[in-house]
Amino acid sequence: GVAGADAPICLYTDLDFPYTTNSIITLLQQLTSAQFDIAAGVKNKNYYKHVPPFRRFISKLLRACTGFVLRLKVADTQCGLKGFNEKGKELFLSTTIDRYLFDLEFIFLASKNKQVTITPVPIELNENVHFSSMRLGILFTEAKNFITIFFKNFK
């Protein structure tokens, strides 16, 4: 995993590699320019055309909460394409959530750290990507994780 990586830049994505090669290249260019420590993929309107309605609702609700409640530098924390340099890696390894919202915790920590720079990178999906439905149990677990992150906001 990331802890064992010795490359100057790390990228990670979803298991099914749903993003275009151009999206990955653009994200990598943001990091190799040495202007940013973290590059976070962000979904556009076309992305949501491929997502089942309930999943779209949950995604947009979380995006609104992260932007409004947590005031993160990148409100779209759940796009599964991100990258970082050594400074970002250190922050990534300090996360404690090991489920879906680990991305949110990572972006939260980056947004609160004045020594770390982060940039959003618009992404595109590959054609023929299919999304699975979300189980209700996952939502309850992740709601607890969101509350944990929310209370870290006051420390």
Segments predicted by a language model, with ranges:
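C-terminal catalytic/acceptor-binding lobe
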Residues: 115-155
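Conserved residues at the C-terminal ends of beta-strands
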Residues: 13, 42, 124
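Acceptor/aglycone-binding surface of glycosyltransferases and processive sugar-polymer synthases
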Residues: 1-4, 21-100, 127-144
